[in-house]
Amino acid sequence: MVRPSPLDPRKSPKQARSAATVEIILEAAARILESKGLPGYTTNAVAEKAGVSVGSLYQYFPGKDALTGALIRRETSVLMEEAEEAARDASGENALKRMIAAAVAHQLRRPALARILDFEEARWPDVQDIRRVKEKLMALLAEVLAMPDLPPQADREVAAADVLAMVRGMIDAAGEREEVERDDLERRVRRAVFGFLK
């Protein structure tokens, strides 16, 4: 029997009203993380901010970790949609530039939240859906690196993993420094990635 992850929700909303309640709870959690950080992030604080009872919160999320997992899934799904769209570009160079732009935008859209969720995600490296997202991103990158207008790589999977680590490392470091200048960060990441691929 597969044991549920501590990041799994208790139940999924079936009706539109329930889905709206879950979204309100998630947004309240995001705002608390942004304004109070992890020390102020409690289920009671989230319920109060969302305007729901703690019991209502616990209907969907058995605890803080499940709430955090749902936030990670929500934020990551936005990044994945943007990366998938970018990877469809006919030019490898443009696809890679657009993927970098999506990653930078993702970090800078809500930088405090992104920093905290990155930290929390690192606590759960073996959770299946987190691992699946990384694998999907690496597969997308490997496909882009195979495009004929980019320099050939001896091992595309290794190159994709290196590029992903480089992009994430630079963007996370910029987030830790609380950088907000999107164009400059994008330029630096592009320079590093394309320099590496030559």
Model-flagged regions — what are they?
Residues 25-33, 75, 79, 103, ...:
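Short hydrophobic clusters on alpha-helical segments that form packing/core surfaces
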Residues 71-98:
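Amphipathic alpha-helical linker/stalk segments
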Residues 68-75, 117, 133:
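Alpha-helical DNA-contacting segments of helix-turn-helix folds
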Residues 77-80, 97-101, 105-109, 124-150, ...:
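Amphipathic alpha-helical packing segments from all-alpha helical-bundle domains
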Residues 1-20:
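N-terminal intrinsically disordered/low-complexity leader segments
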Residues 84-86, 117-124:
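Short linear capping/connector segments at secondary-structure termini
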Residues 20, 24, 28, 32-66:
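Helix-turn-helix
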Residues 143-147, 164-182, 194-198:
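Amphipathic C-terminal alpha-helical segment
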